[in-house]
Amino acid sequence: MDNRLLEILVCPLCKGKLEYDRAAQELICHADKLAYPIRDGIPVMLADEARQSVPGRAVNPDGPASGN
């Protein structure tokens, strides 16, 4: 991900800073605990496409935590 793009992108909900997770290909908003996917190199900045993100584990917004 281009660092210049990362500097201007913000969470669409809280307008907070995002962190790039290279391994998961996601942009993480720690304030809202959301992970926005990056598909084919393009960040998908739609709240409906984000998944809940909790440090240390992923949480499915429609079901139980994964990894349990």
From Swiss-Prot:
Coiled-coil intervals, chain numbering: none
Source domain of life: Bacteria
Gene Ontology, cellular component aspect: cytosol
InterPro entries: Trm112-like
SUPFAM superfamilies in UniProt: Trm112p-like (SSF158997)
Family recorded in the similarity comment: Belongs to the UPF0434 family.
Name used for this protein in its record: UPF0434 protein H16_A0605
Lineage, opening ranks: Bacteria, Pseudomonadati, Pseudomonadota, Betaproteobacteria, Burkholderiales
